[in-house]
């Protein structure tokens, strides 16, 4: 692949050509990706970290998924899968699509944190959520 002098920015969507050699649920081929890496690192590196964007809206309430508003350049309503991240070489970029707004990027950042948090943090967050729900329903006990 030829080296491209492309400046990518956190929050930008690109169509990228990802390697086809994958197994299981790992995404591959020509597909949209969202730049998640910090801008200072994007400037210094020929690669960047990106989350997969898919038009298959499954498990939309999963804490690592963020449904995007309708975006020009994406043929269908799509979703970011924060748990599916890649190191993408800038030479793999096919074209620029668009940039998501700050409120969407905040949701994506939360989803990225959830995908990387420890099991203990996840367990505590879930326990707190269920305890709150029980209180709302007027139930007591554990």
Residue ranges of predicted features:
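Short, charged beta-turn/beta-strand-edge "cap" motif at the junction between a beta-strand
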Residues: 19-23
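C-terminal terminal-subdomain/extension
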Residues: 2, 6, 70-142
